[in-house]
Amino acid sequence: MGIKRALWWMVVCVVVLQVSAQHWSHGLNPGGKRAVMQESAEEIPRSSGYLCDYVAVSPGNKPFRLKDLLTPVAGREIEE
């Protein structure tokens, strides 16, 4: 009797795990189909590039630009 009960609970646990493990979130359809995701991705407008020219500058040039911006300010402070 104890073995049948333990086997029964094991089968119930396996079934519960299998049923609860299959979930469909974020609009995914059963079977891993992503039709909804593709439609929403097509609705998003694509950007052609950077919105700001300063962002497109390579990281090596940024300190020089900062120095060029601060030089006139430092010169004005010395003159005053």
UniProtKB/Swiss-Prot annotation:
InterPro entries: GnRH
Compartments it resides in: Secreted
Any one GO cellular component localisation term in the record: extracellular space
Signal peptide location: 1-21
GO MF term list: hormone activity
Coiled-coil ranges from the UniProt annotation: none
This protein's record includes keyword Repeat: no
Cross-referenced PROSITE patterns: GNRH
Keywords annotated in UniProt: Amidation, Cleavage on pair of basic residues, Hormone, Pyrrolidone carboxylic acid, Secreted, Signal
One Pfam family in the UniProt entry: GnRH
Main location group: secreted
Positions of post-translational Pyrrolidone carboxylic acid modification: 22
Residue positions where Glycine amide is found in the record: 31
Function: Stimulates the secretion of gonadotropins.
Family statement: Belongs to the GnRH family.
Protein name: Progonadoliberin-1
Organism whose genome encodes this protein: Clarias gariepinus (North African catfish)
Phylogenetic placement of the source organism: Eukaryota, Metazoa, Chordata, Craniata, Vertebrata
